[in-house]
Amino acid sequence: TRKEVPVPVKIVESTMTEQAKAVADYWQAAANDKNAVERFAPEGGEILAAAVVTEEGNYDYALPATTDMIWDFMGQFYRYGGGVLSNAISWKVDYEEMGVEFRSFTDSQGIDRQYLVYIPEAYRGSGEQLPVVIAYHGASTSMRNFFENTLWYNIADEEGIMLVFPESTLVPVPPTLGGGEANPTAYRALWQVEDPELRYTDVVYAEDLLDQLIAVYPQVDQGRIYCTGHSMGCMMTHYLGSAEVSHRFAAMGATSGPLMAREETGSQTVPMFMTMAQYDMWSYDLNQDDTMTTQAVDMWLVRNGLADASNVVEGRKTGATETYVEGRYNNSVWENEDGIPLFRYAWVTGKDHVNLPAENQLLWDEWFSQITLDTETGVRAYQGQAIG
């Protein structure tokens, strides 16, 4: 309903006519309820939940100043996601004021790469070793989009996390992706997971990026590096999880992306937390066989020693150690013999194909923050207990 999705509105009228009053009354009636605001707009909720505010002034609609005034209002907001139950509104950020760093380097393949880094102000130059979350954006978006709409920076400020958002490359759209077959000259910002000939270039990029971060930022805690992403960024997380580069991550966790590509070089146990949406682009149902979603789940169950090729289907359908519902999250957890969770899957009720800030908070609170890596032995620990 109109009360369920926060919509910032600025109405400019020369006089308060009956018609103008009717418009203002409409938006007053649609004033955002507190629960909706908390769900969709974690930042600035009190502003969005406030009653409609009106002001009187003299405006010349032909003046550039009026256009600038309207743009100044609209341009401060950012919305991601189109579903009523799963989109978030946030504020555009001032990167310079926040202290975000934009970095570039040429990787070992000769490809120019870009990424952004955010270190909370309280930790800059402190010398304190910080956990690092590397977040891969989705198809046709960018590191800036993903930085702004995930609100990971709020979690970073609260928990003392270094954030890294890599940028993908502008490449021809493959036939498997919408628009590619109809328009072979189209280019979009994509990870290369859909191109068998080029996909490994992004594995090399991931390796080289880790080397760059360690060389440039002494504060990187190599035992607490985590990988996340959304949509195609989740596909990247799966792909990197199947490769040897995964040995450098303490844990992985990502949202709304199935298995698109895999290697067979990853051998260490790497805990993974995967979410899908009830109204996602791919089925969330683990009882369906051989879907792109269940292919991802099966890969992780086998990879982490929770099943083998002969029984993974049964293990996926009935082998979870624990299943439970918490809020919108329908959880299934697979634990090893020591009771340590190595794979967690959750489908989110009422969610579309979008990354919610609440999901990222969950990934940090209940997954990443619980897991560390001994870089000398390759052994991970969950809440201090070694993962055998």
Regions found by a protein language model. Name each.
Residues 11, 274-276:
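Short beta-strand/loop motif that positions the catalytic acidic residue
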